[in-house]
């Protein structure tokens, strides 16, 4: 006796469902890692943008590096409230943000925010051996003058005009980027 009905057997259906389940599982495991890597890439690009702003600042200020700390208080509007609260500060770290890191159409808007929309704080200080790399995501970009990068960590440079930017990434440790390569 031969059955001529067309259709799938239960084994074929279960096999297709199992394969589909594996594909969905791989997507759900890989997607957060891809998103985290994408956010870290944006942070690296932000660090390069900050380096460029510092180089421009140096060029406009007789080779002097900016100094100080520009931490902005929390606000409901991370792009406007934080920057407005800090834009009138006189230290050169805040001037760096105000004059070199603003929106081209509106100088009162701080566009220097991380991929999550949180405003970056900037701490600019002379490197010393006691510096500890950030161990958590605190949205602080550490600019260390008189330093160069040794992998992920800064180290003392013989040139006082060298600087590095150190930031804790979300997925892959600490990122150290220097102006000397």
For the regions a protein language model found, what residue spans apply to each?
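Membrane-proximal amphipathic alpha-helices
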Residues: 36-50
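Intrinsic disorder/low-complexity segments enriched in polar/small residues
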Residues: 1-3, 119, 137, 163
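A generic fold-level signal
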Residues: 5, 42, 157-160
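N-terminal single-pass transmembrane signal-anchor helix
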Residues: 4-35, 39
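Alpha-helix exit/C-cap motif
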Residues: 32, 52-73, 102-106
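Acidic, glycine-rich loop-and-strand cores that form catalytic or ligand-binding grooves
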Residues: 68-148
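Short, surface-exposed interaction loops/tails
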Residues: 142-181
């Amino acid at each position: 006796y031969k059955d001529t009905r067309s259709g799938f057997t239960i084994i074929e259906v279960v096999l297709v469902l199992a394969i589909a389940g594996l594909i969905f599982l791989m997507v759900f495991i890989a997607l957060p890692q891809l998103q985290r890597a994408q956010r870290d890439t944006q942070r690296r690009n932000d660090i390069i943008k900050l380096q460029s702003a510092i180089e421009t600042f140096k060029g406009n200020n007789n080779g002097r590096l900016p100094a100080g700390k520009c931490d902005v208080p929390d606000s409901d509007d991370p792009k406007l409230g934080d920057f407005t609260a800090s834009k009138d500060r006189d230290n050169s770290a805040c001037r760096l943000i105000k004059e070199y890191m603003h929106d081209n159409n509106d100088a009162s808007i701080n566009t220097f925010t991380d991929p999550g929309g949180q405003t970056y704080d900037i701490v600019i200080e002379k490197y010393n051996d006691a510096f500890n790399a950030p161990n958590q995501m605190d949205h602080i970009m550490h600019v260390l003058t008189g330093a160069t990068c040794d992998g992920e960590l800064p180290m003392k440079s013989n040139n006082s005009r060298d600087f590095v930017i150190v930031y804790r990434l979300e997925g892959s440790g600490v990122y150290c980027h220097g102006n000397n390569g």
